């Protein structure tokens, strides 16, 4: 009997197994940011420990930083966390991409673009959306602060092996429909707990057709379905993406042969299998307060089924049976570790080129990293956005979460390319609607949601 991709990744990293069935995994890459690391580093000091492998650790500033006036940090706690990370990285000799550094950006954007993220690695970070890196055939998952300390001190982590879920995506995506819509469709159909206890492996015709940035979007939101991680077997697109990047292996050809072994064998059975035909999918919009509360753009909002629906409708200021086209949009956020890469910005720019943001709408574009920002500016995307009425910002987590200056006022609606729409996620009382970059860009032009499939733009990604 063959092995699943999860089995191969797991077995290659088991150092020991204890009497409770937990495996001690070796960690190949530990990504660090300013929010979940201060207590972990302090724990090292209190126990007189060092960072076991600073060469396998990489830190950046992303969650708390302003994206407009980046050096003017007025929040006392945010400034303290940023200063503390600088001090910790200096003391423990951990590489740091600080504000203004050419390598700085959202942790799950810079990992792949710098070549730190590679097939076959185990990757952890004190952040829920570490699953993003699974798009490269890596086993990547978020950890808590006590686990951050454990990895810093030992470069290992005790874990119980999850079950394997296979999600087969067959067919070809229609124009105007993207990876973001696939994951929102899956969540709306199967809920936020379907992946509990599992690692989701995405595969199939639609996966083969996607570029790496769309694959990252899928894996990024596997956690929203309750999964430990999301993974995709590496292929030639993966290898080509990694090749030549700053931290990519120097012995690329020999390493590539090992990477080519990372796939699920044909004769295996998943613990759970889901089949989705993407051919007839439509753009999705979330209406409620978790990512599974979403509908196709051409559907009406659902009826109330329980107290959760009742609360969500009340919080969002919406009604059952309401048209998605009637949902007002006062804010648009194009960014986050889900959709802030160059291809995301290119799609959004193609939608708004030569047009104007609706009066009364505040629209932000926040590139995921300094390198994404520079590449976008080289293509002139910043001029397209600014001429349309968007704000062009510096890299950071920004409006994805309400812990920096970029927030949505209470009671107002935001079309957001981020990954979570919980109550207060973008600020106290903020009403978040998760959509693709194309849908967010179009909403900025109209002040409400529209069906991007009916708009004239040339931003479709080729899936040939």
From Swiss-Prot:
E.C. designation(s): 4.2.1.33
Cofactor(s) required for function per UniProt: [4Fe-4S] cluster
Biological processes, Gene Ontology terms: L-leucine biosynthetic process
GO molecular function, one term: metal ion binding
Catalytic activity: (2R,3S)-3-isopropylmalate = (2S)-2-isopropylmalate
Top EC class, one word: lyase
Keywords for the protein's UniProt record, in alphabetical order: 4Fe-4S, Amino-acid biosynthesis, Branched-chain amino acid biosynthesis, Iron, Iron-sulfur, Leucine biosynthesis, Lyase, Metal-binding
Residues reported to bind [4Fe-4S] cluster: 337, 397, 400
Cofactor annotation remark: Binds 1 [4Fe-4S] cluster per subunit.
Pathway assigned to this chain's UniProt record: Amino-acid biosynthesis; L-leucine biosynthesis; L-leucine from 3-methyl-2-oxobutanoate: step 2/4
Quaternary structure annotation from Swiss-Prot or TrEMBL: Heterodimer of LeuC and LeuD.
Function text: Catalyzes the isomerization between 2-isopropylmalate and 3-isopropylmalate, via the formation of 2-isopropylmaleate.
PANTHER family: 3-ISOPROPYLMALATE DEHYDRATASE, HOMOACONITASE, MITOCHONDRIAL-RELATED
Entry similarity comment: Belongs to the aconitase/IPM isomerase family. LeuC type 1 subfamily.
The protein, known as: 3-isopropylmalate dehydratase large subunit
UniProt source species: Bacillus cereus (strain B4264)
Organism placement in taxonomy: Bacteria, Bacillati, Bacillota, Bacilli, Bacillales
Name of the gene: leuC
């Amino acid at each position: 009997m063959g092995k699943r991709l999860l089995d191969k990744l797991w077995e290659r990293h088991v150092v020991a197994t204890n009497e409770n069935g937990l495996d001690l995994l070796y960690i190949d890459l530990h990504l660090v940011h300013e929010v979940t690391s201060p207590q972990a580093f302090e724990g090292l000091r209190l126990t007189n420990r060092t960072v076991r492998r600073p060469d396998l650790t990489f830190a950046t500033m992303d969650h708390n930083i302003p994206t407009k006036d980046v050096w003017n940090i007025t929040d006392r706690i945010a400034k303290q966390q940023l200063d503390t990370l600088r001090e910790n990285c200096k003391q423990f000799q951990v590489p740091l991409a600080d504000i203004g550094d050419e390598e700085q950006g959202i942790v799950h954007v810079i990992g792949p673009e710098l070549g730190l993220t590679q097939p076959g690695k185990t990757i952890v970070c004190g952040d829920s959306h570490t699953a993003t890196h699974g798009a490269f055939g890596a086993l990547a998952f978020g950890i808590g602060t006590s686990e951050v300390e454990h990895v810093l001190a030992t470069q290992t982590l005790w874990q119980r092996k999850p079950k394997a879920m296979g999600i087969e995506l067959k067919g070809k995506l229609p124009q105007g429909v993207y990876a973001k819509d696939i994951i929102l469709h899956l969540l709306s159909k199967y809920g936020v707990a379907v992946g509990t206890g599992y690692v989701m492996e995405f595969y199939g015709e639609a996966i083969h057709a996607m570029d790496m940035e769309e694959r990252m979007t899928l894996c990024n939101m596997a956690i929203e379905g309750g999964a430990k991680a999301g993974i995709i077997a590496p292929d030639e697109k993966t290898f080509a993406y990694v090749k030549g990047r700053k931290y990519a292996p120097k012995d690329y050809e020999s390493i590539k042969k090992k990477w080519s072994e990372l796939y699920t064998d044909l004769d295996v059975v998943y613990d759970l299998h889901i089949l989705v035909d993407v051919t007839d999918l439509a753009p999705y919009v979330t209406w409620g307060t978790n990512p599974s509360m979403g509908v196709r753009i051409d559907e009406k909002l659902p009826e109330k089924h329980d107290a959760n629906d009742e609360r969500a409708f009340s919080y969002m200021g919406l009604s059952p049976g309401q048209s998605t086209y009637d949902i007002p949009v006062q804010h648009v956020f194009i960014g986050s570790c889900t959709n802030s890469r160059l291809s995301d910005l290119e799609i959004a720019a193609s939608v708004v080129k030569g047009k104007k943001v609706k009066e009364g709408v505040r629209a932000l574009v926040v590139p995921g990293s300094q390198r994404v920002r520079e590449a976008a500016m080289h293509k002139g995307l910043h001029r397209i956005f600014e001429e349309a009425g968007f704000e062009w910002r510096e890299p950071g987590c920004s409006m994805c979460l309400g812990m920096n200056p970029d927030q949505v006022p209470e009671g107002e609606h935001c079309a957001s390319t981020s990954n979570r729409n919980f109550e207060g996620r973008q600020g106290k009382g903020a009403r978040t609607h998760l959509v693709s970059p194309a849908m967010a860009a179009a909403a900025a032009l109209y002040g409400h949601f529209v069906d991007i499939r009916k708009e004239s733009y040339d931003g479709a990604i080729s899936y040939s």
